[in-house]
């Protein structure tokens, strides 16, 4: 009969048992139910197309819209049809000036529908990066410096903190 070292076996069993509980020891993210955003980057390629990148969190996992989300409050004429809004500002004579864009007057605002994001696992919290391809990203104007003020809205109509891009020169 082989002599078993119970001290080593006990240590091994305790270490294995403790490792089973480790995933439960990792704290779950504790994000607020309102989306939170942070501007990451704004890059323009050689074709003058731009990509806006923002980081987001959402504590209850209700971010994004399906294409079929077309009834109120998400209908095409409703205020909540778009869930990512980039308000356009220009630097005019040393002061930032908001330039409102009015669709009824044929102007196209920098508004987007971010697709629905499904939480992975059992915890609903979301954390990730949104990248928006902006084929048109500036207005024809005598002023050459702009920025975007960005907000993100979830399906419960919670609006994120606003964040602002760095200044952008056309």
Q: What are the residue ranges of the model-derived segments?
A:
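C-terminal motif of bacterial Sec signal peptides marking the signal peptidase cleavage site
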Residues: 20-24
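Non-catalytic macromolecular-recognition regions in eukaryotic signaling proteins
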Residues: 27-170
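Intrinsically disordered, low-complexity segments enriched in Ser/Pro/Gly/Ala and basic residues
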Residues: 6-7, 18, 46, 52
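Bacterial N-terminal signal peptides that target proteins for export
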Residues: 2-12
């Amino acid at each position: 009969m082989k002599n078993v070292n119970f001290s080593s076996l006990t240590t091994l069993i305790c270490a294995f048992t403790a490792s089973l509980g480790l995933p439960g020891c990792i704290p779950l993210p504790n994000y607020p139910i309102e989306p939170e955003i942070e501007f990451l980057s704004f890059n323009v390629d050689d074709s003058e197309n731009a990509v806006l990148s923002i980081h987001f969190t959402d504590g209850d996992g209700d971010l994004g819209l399906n294409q079929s989300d077309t009834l109120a409050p998400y209908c095409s004429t409703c205020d909540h049809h778009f869930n990512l809004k980039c308000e356009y500002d220009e630097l005019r004579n040393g002061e930032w000036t908001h330039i409102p864009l009015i669709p009824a007057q044929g102007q196209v605002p920098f508004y987007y529908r971010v697709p629905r994001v499904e939480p992975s696992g059992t915890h609903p919290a979301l954390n990730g990066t949104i990248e928006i391809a902006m084929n048109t990203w500036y207005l024809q104007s005598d002023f050459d410096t702009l920025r975007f003020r960005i907000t993100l809205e979830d399906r419960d109509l919670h609006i994120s903190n606003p964040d602002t891009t760095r200044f952008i020169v056309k």
